[in-house]
Amino acid sequence: QPDPTVSQQAFMASSELTLAYIQTGDAQVDAVSKAGLTGLSQMLFARTSIEPATPAGLDLERDALVFYPLIYWPMTPNQPLPSQQAYRKLNAFMRSGGMILFDSRDGDIAGYGAASPNGRQLQKITYGLDIPVLEAIPPDHVLTRTFYLLQDFPGRYTAPEIWVEAAPQAAQKVDGMPFRNLNDGVSPVVIGGNDWAAAWAQDAQGNPMFQVGRTPQA
C-alpha cells in the first residue's frame, strides 16, 4: 500500500514550487534543513512573485524526486549510502534539469572537504552519481546573480570555493552582456561547505537562528 502522506506530498509538489532536502537521519541536521528551506522560501515570497509551498523532507529510498527543482543535501559523517535504485533516481533527476546542492557544512575548517568527516562522506556518496566535470564557480556564473547566494555565497561559513559544472569550451561572452553564456548557467550540482541551511534558518520572529559569515579556522 502506498504511503498516503508521501502521495500527498508529491501531489502538492507537482502543483506548487517546493524546495526539498534529503533527510539524513540526524534529527538536528534535518530540523535545520527544514528551517533553512522555510526561511529561503519566505525570502522568495517576499522578494519575488513566487509563493513556494512548505519545504519537503525526502527519503531517498521511498520518495519521488522529479517534482522538486532544488534538493538541498547536507552531509553528516554517518548517513547511509544510497541504494542502487536511489542512485538511479538521483541521476535521472539531474539529467531532467533538477539541481542538487551538496553541503558538507565544514566551511569553518581550514582545508575543508576531504579533510573532514563530512567531506569524506560526501566523496563516498557522490562516487555513485553521474556528476559532470566540475570547476570552481566563475564570477560570471548565473548563481552569482541570485539574491539567496550572492557574490561570495555566504552561509553560516564563508569557505573559499564553490564547485559547479564546468562551462563548455565554446562558452562566449555576448556583446553588451556582463557575463558569458554558460548554457544558461544551469548546473545539476553545486558543491560547497558553507552550511547554507543554517544561514537561511529563521525563528518565529524572523530572526536568524545561527551566527553567519564565519571564516575558516586553522
What feature does the model see in each segment?
Residues A10-S15, D63-F67, A86, F93-R95, ...:
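Extracellular/periplasmic catalytic domains that process cell-envelope and extracellular macromolecules
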Residues T18-Y21, P69-W73, M99-D103, V133-A136, ...:
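Structural recognition of the beta-strand scaffold that forms the well-ordered cores
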Residues V32-G39, M43, Q85, K89, ...:
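Extracytoplasmic/secreted proteins, especially bacterial periplasmic and envelope-associated proteins
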Residues L40-E51, P74, A92-S96, K124-P132:
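Structured segments of extracytoplasmic/periplasmic soluble domains
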Residues L70-G119:
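Short alpha-beta junction capping motif
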